Structures are given as structure tokens and as C-alpha cells.
A protein has these predicted regions:
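Helical element adjacent to the flavin cofactor pocket in flavoenzyme catalytic cores
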Residues: 146-196, 200-204
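Helix-loop-beta segment of a Rossmann-like dinucleotide-binding subdomain
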Residues: 87-100, 112-113, 119, 123-170, ...
Length: 373
């Protein structure tokens, strides 16, 4: 039986961020990942936009405030990870251009701008010509837009690798192919059994298994956590744009990487655990992206990536203790903001595991859905 100080269930971006942070505090940490890191987690099919401004009108105010706090942490957090891992995570602060293709789109941008100003976010209106100056790949259909200088991007797949490297450099360990079969408390210790027959025992467990979290939590630990999978597909194209600025319309986003890749997303499909991407969804992504960026037509289609976002009933993440003894914690419900909220989530859980509190922990307390036994 392996006996670390903390077991983290889930090797996605949230689980690895939490594990890496806890390992930095001197704890012995083991991460149990059901597949291979980056294979089936939501981040593997994410574009990596850090976009509190672009999504200010479609996100609960509490979640936007959380995103802004995490956003402030990002530059220093990324710099530390890149130094520890010896690799770039594709962090780019070129900003985002949100464009409209007709009068209806421009009206939506007015509402978006109003939401942004309520949060004190920087935004600047653009004419069609100004938008094309900032992203020369834009086509003639663009009639106006907004420049969001504080909406950035990171490559989630590289971020996962960097987190794992930094975790291991801090003495942590990732066990792949370790799907959790049961989680039970015995003599003050949590015993985590995998489907492969292995067992890990620890005083503290953090379940950060994304959409799978409710399946991992023991039934007698409290009421069901209202998290469900929402499938999303993105397209990976084998060429970049003329600049690394992200392009968004009200219907699609296009994220160019500096090294010659472009990610187009994303579908939102309530279809349970079915993994296959639908042709109709792929068609819509291509149709909408090429309306703004005709050059998409000439790009090689390299991959259709599918992931399951952990959606939660009130669209506010659940991060904190799930039992009264503060030995079982959860970190899930981030939906489309797991990459963006990873540093804040890790900081909140470290503070809680240290026996303290975090100024934002009350907003994300998972027991708001019903007190655990």
C-alpha cells in the first residue's frame, strides 16, 4: 500500500495544478489518473483562452470575479512553471479581437462591452479596418469589433506537460491508468482502490476528476454533487494566422499558436458520455470560422479533439472540503474555465489544507448543494 500525505484523483489541468501546489508545500503527493495525462481530460480538447472579458456577458458574476483573480495570478504562475519544467506553455498576451459580421453581431458586442465595463475591464471599439490591422487574416465580412487587451491564451497540452514536470521535480508522482474503483475511510485514513487492484492510503484526498468526480465520491460522504459531462469538440488546423491574436465572433473562436497551429472551437453538446464528434458540429465550426477568416479553407485539418467539460448546476466551481473533518476535498465544476481557474483553485485548496481559509473559498464551497455527513 502506497502511503503519501495527499492523493489527488484526476490528472487534468486542475488536478495537476492542485497537486503541484501541494507538493511545493512539502507534502508527499500522488496523482491517480484514469488514462494518460492529457488523453481524455477536458483540457486536452480546450483552446486555452484566458478570457474573462470576452465571456463577461455569458458567465455568472461570481465566476467572472474568480476568473479575474486567477487572471492576475497567471503571469507569475506561468513563469514559475516554465522555469521549473524547462519548457514553454505557449503563454501569449497579444490580446483578443472580437469581431462582428453583421448588424446583429454588432448589437451583441454592445451588450458585451457593457458587461465588461461593469467589471472594470479594458475594451476598445474597432472599425473593420482597425480590426484587420490587428489581425490581418480577417476577411471582408468583418464590419467592426472590440479589442480585449487583457484576454490571453495558453496551450493546455503544453501546460499539462509543464505541470507534470514541475510536480515531479517537487517530489510528486503521477500514476497513469489508475481508474479509482472505490474510496473509503478506515481508521482515520482514506483508502483509494483502483480497478487494477492497487491501493493507496492517505489522510487527505482531493477529488479533481472533472466530470467524473461524482462517480468517485463515496455515496455516504454527502448528497450527490450536481456535476454532469458536457461534450465539446475543437478542430486543430495545421497552420497559423498572421498574428497570434485570438479571434472571436459571437459563434466561434479561433486561437492561433505562434508555432503554426490554429484551434477552432467549440461545440457544446449535452450527450452524456458519447465521445464521437458529430459531423454537423464540425461543419458549423468550419462554416463560422471561415466567415471571419477565409484562410481557414486552405488549412490542413489535423485533429478533431473531444473532451467532457464538468458542468455544474449553478455554473460556479465547487472547490473545498466535502466532509466535516476536512480530509476529503473536491475541485470540479469549472466547466469551460478549468485552464483559466487552475492557479486560483490550487491556491484555495492549499490554504484550506494548511488549516486556514481563503477570501474566495465561501463562493466555491461545494457544500452549498447540501451539507456532507
Amino acid at each position: 500500500v502506497v502511503t503519501p500525505d495527499v492523493v489527488v484523483v484526476g490528472g487534468g489541468v486542475v488536478g495537476l495544478a492542485v497537486a503541484e501546489e501541494l507538493a511545493g508545500s512539502g507534502r508527499r503527493v500522488v496523482v491517480l489518473e484514469r488514462d494518460r495525462v492529457g488523453e481524455t481530460c477536458a483540457a486536452a480538447a480546450a483552446a486555452g483562452m484566458l478570457a474573462p472579458a470576452a465571456e463577461a456577458d455569458a458567465t455568472p458574476p461570481v465566476t467572472t470575479q474568480l476568473a479575474l483573480e486567477s487572471h492576475r495570478m497567471y503571469p507569475e504562475w506561468v513563469a514559475r512553471l516554465e522555469s521549473a519544467s524547462g519548457m514553454s506553455v505557449g503563454f501569449d498576451r497579444s490580446g483578443t479581437v472580437v469581431v462582428g459580421l453583421d448588424a446583429d453581431d454588432l448589437r451583441e458586442l454592445v451588450h458585451l462591452e457593457q458587461a465588461q465595463r461593469r467589471f472594470g475591464l479594458r475594451t476598445r471599439r474597432l472599425s473593420a479596418a482597425e480590426a484587420r490591422d490587428l489581425q490581418p487574416s480577417l476577411g471582408p465580412s468583418v464590419v467592426g469589433g472590440l479589442l480585449l487587451e487583457d484576454d490571453w491564451q495558453v496551450d493546455p497540452r503544453r501546460l499539462l506537460q509543464a505541470l507534470q514536470r514541475s510536480l515531479e521535480a517537487r517530489g510528486g508522482r503521477v500514476v497513469e491508468g489508475a481508474e479509482v474503483r472505490s474510496l473509503r475511510r478506515q481508521d482515520g485514513t482514506w483508502r483509494v482502490s483502483t480497478r487494477g487492484g492497487d491501493e493507496v492510503a492517505a489522510r487527505t484526498v482531493v477529488v479533481a476528476a472533472g466530470a467524473w468526480t461524482p462517480q468517485v465520491l463515496p455515496a455516504d460522504a454527502g448528497p450527490p454533487l450536481p456535476v454532469r459531462p458536457v461534450r465539446g469538440a475543437v478542430l486543430r488546423l495545421g497552420a497559423g494566422l498572421e498574428t497570434a491574436r485570438v479571434v472571436r465572433t459571437p459563434r466561434v473562436y479561433v486561437v492561433p499558436r505562434a508555432w503554426g497551429e490554429t484551434v477552432v472551437g467549440a461545440t457544446v453538446e449535452e450527450r452524456g458520455w458519447a465521445r464521437e464528434a458529430l459531423a454537423g458540429g464540425v461543419y458549423e465550426l468550419l462554416r463560422e470560422s471561415r466567415r471571419a477568416l477565409p484562410c481557414v479553407d486552405e488549412m490542413p485539418l489535423r485533429e478533431v479533439a473531444v473532451g467532457f467539460r464538468p458542468a455544474i448546476r449553478d455554473n460556479v466551481p465547487a472547490v473545498g472540503a466535502w466532509d466535516d473533518d476536512r480530509t476529503l476535498f473536491v475541485a470540479t465544476g469549472h466547466y469551460r474555465k478549468g485552464v483559466e481557474l487552475a492557479p486560483l483553485t490550487a491556491a484555495v485548496l492549499r490554504r484550506l489544507l494548511d488549516g486556514g481559509d481563503h477570501p474566495l473559498s465561501s463562493y466555491v464551497d461545494p457544500r452549498r448543494f447540501g451539507r456532507a455527513a
